[in-house]
């Protein structure tokens, strides 16, 4: 491994054009003026790299055929499948194949500003003098500045500013709706995860951020214990809470809930208020928490506050995919993608 350390010291020494920028952890980071090779150590940062500077991506932290990504999606470039998969620091994953990663000569590492992983990531890459740029992207409201920050790191400021301003406008519209509804008038929402629907997220968890941003009464209030989340609850607890709306992340659960007698008595089921989270190309609410949540909160607002949400969600979806993912989408494709 010493030869790799020497190699990277030499490469960075030979980088004549560099700049000092501040990451979202408040650290001064020296990065190349022109980034040609980057690596994102977690899926949220990888998706930011993709919408800003896909040509710089050297490797994936998760394979394109993992359950994070929609199977055979047409909204991500197929070239991603050709990139080596080296791992990263996120969820239950703690580490990358450093030999492979170092052979790709990344000039900058985009990493998650999370107390769960920061120290380990910083320590790992300090040994090789590779700059680590931390990005805060836990909450939905972090997204505009996360985009701007990644844009500065990757030398894509203009593109980042265009996306960030669009994100701010979309989020402001949803926030205005949220703020117009008294807290005691907001629907009670249960976020059902897993094939049995008995995993969920704490109200204070970053996994629950889209729901909190839109304005709901959470079915459960607790404290997130791990980066993964997925807090277990039982049927008796759910029946006692009797949510107005259920948002399901798992398609198997969504399909089964309508005929499952255990769930039949719930208000949300009886009133046909169970919704499946859109996931093409990735989950628009969570896992990973990404820029897709900008559209995700619009979709949530359209189903949770339908009287107040006056925009055409299909047009919002198509324009989002065009701007962020550079993909055209018909009205029919938009309807299929978000389940309308």
Regions found by a protein language model. Name each.
Residues 46-102, 108, 112-114, 219:
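A short, structured surface patch at a secondary-structure boundary
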Residues 95-106, 231-242:
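Short helices/loops that flank or line small-molecule/ion binding pockets
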């Amino acid at each position: 491994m010493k030869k790799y350390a020497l190699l990277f010291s030499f490469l960075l020494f030979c980088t004549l054009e560099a700049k000092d920028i501040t990451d979202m952890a408040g650290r001064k980071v020296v990065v190349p003026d022109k980034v040609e090779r980057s690596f994102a150590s977690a899926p949220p940062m990888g998706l930011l790299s993709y919408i800003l500077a896909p040509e710089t991506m050297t490797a994936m932290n998760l394979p394109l055929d993992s359950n994070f990504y929609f199977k055979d999606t047409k909204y991500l470039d197929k070239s991603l499948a050709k990139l080596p998969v080296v791992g990263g620091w996120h969820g239950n994953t703690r580490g990358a194949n450093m030999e492979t990663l170092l052979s790709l000569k990344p000039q900058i590492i985009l990493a998650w500003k999370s107390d769960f992983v920061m120290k380990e990531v910083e320590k790992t890459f300090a040994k090789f003098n590779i700059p680590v740029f931390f990005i805060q992207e836990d909450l939905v409201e972090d997204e505009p500045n996360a985009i701007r920050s990644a844009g500065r790191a990757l030398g894509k400021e203009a593109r980042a500013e265009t996306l960030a301003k669009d994100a701010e406008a979309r989020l402001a519209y949803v926030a205005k709706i949220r703020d117009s509804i008294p807290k005691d008038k907001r629907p009670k929402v249960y976020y059902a995860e897993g094939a049995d629907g008995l995993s969920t997220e704490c109200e204070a968890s970053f996994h629950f951020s889209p729901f909190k941003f839109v304005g709901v009464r959470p079915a459960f209030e607790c404290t997130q214990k791990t980066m993964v989340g997925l807090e277990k609850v039982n049927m008796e607890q759910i029946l006692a809470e009797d949510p107005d709306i259920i948002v399901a992340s798992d398609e198997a659960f969504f399909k089964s809930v309508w005929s499952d007698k255990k769930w039949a008595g719930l208000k949300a089921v009886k009133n046909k208020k169970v919704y499946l989270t859109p996931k093409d190309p990735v989950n628009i609410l969570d896992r990973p928490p990404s820029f897709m949540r900008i559209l995700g909160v619009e979709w949530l607002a359209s189903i949770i506050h339908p009287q107040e949400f006056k925009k055409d969600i299909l047009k919002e979806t198509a324009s989002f995919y065009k701007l962020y993912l550079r993909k055209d989408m018909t009205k029919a494709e938009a309807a299929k993608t978000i389940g309308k």
